[in-house]
Amino acid sequence: VMPKSCLNTECIKDMTVLHGEDGAYQIAFKDKHKTKIKIEVKGDICEYVSVYSVGNVPVMLATFEEAENDPNYISKEPGMYPDMLNPVVDGEIEATGSYQSLWVRVDKKAPPGLHNITVKLSSESEERVCCMDYKIIDISLPESDIVYTQWFHADCLAVYYNVPMWSEENWSLIEKYIKTATGYGINMILTP
C-alpha cells in the first residue's frame, strides 16, 4: 500500500492455506489525524498471529531504463515504498496521515480448521474492525528440496547497529537475522 494510494479495492474477508504453511494478509487504513492507533487481535488462534506495521523506505532508483516499458512495477518513480515490517509493540502504532498498512501473519503451527481473526484498530476519533475467516486445510505439502539462497552481509549488520565487527553483539545479531531468514524459507546464504 503506497502512502499516496487511492484505495477502491474490495475487502477480502476469507482466505485458505494448507496446514504447515505461513499465511499473511494486509489491512490498509488511513487516519487523517497523526495520532496513536491501538491494535487489538482477537480469535481462537490469536497466539499464532503476529502483526507488523509496514514501514516505508526511500527508493532513489525504482527501475532501470531498460525496464521502462515493463507494466509489472508498482511505480517507476523515486519515492517512499512500503517494505520494512516493524513488529507492533505494546499494541500501538503512530498514524502518519497517509495510507498505511498492517501485515498480519499467521504462523504455520496454527491448527487446522476454520478460524476467525479479528483485528480492531482504534484511535481517538474512530474505531474499525477487520474480520478474516481463516481456513487451514488439514493437508500438508511435502518438504521442498528447493535451495533458496540470499545474500547475507554480516559487515552491514555491524555498521548499521554500530557494534564492533565479530564481537559478541555482532554474532548475536547474525544469529537473529539467520534465524529470521530460515523462518521465511531461506535455507542457504551467500556471504561476500
Regions found by a protein language model. Give the residues of each.
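Solvent-exposed, low-complexity, repeat-rich "mucin-like" stalks and linkers
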Residues: I12-I37, S167-S172, K176-K179, Y184
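An acidic-aromatic substrate-binding cleft motif
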Residues: V129-P192
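Sequence-level detector for tyrosine residue identity
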Residues: Y25, Y48, Y52, Y73, ...
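Surface-exposed binding patches on compact interaction domains or structured appendages
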Residues: V1-E10, D22, K32-V104, P111
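Residue-identity detector for threonine
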Residues: T9, T16, T35, T63, ...
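N-terminal basic, low-complexity leaders that serve as flexible interaction/assembly modules and, when applicable
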Residues: P3-S5, T16-V17, P58-T63, A67, ...
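Extended acidic/polar, glycine-enriched regions
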Residues: A28-K38, D90-I146, W171
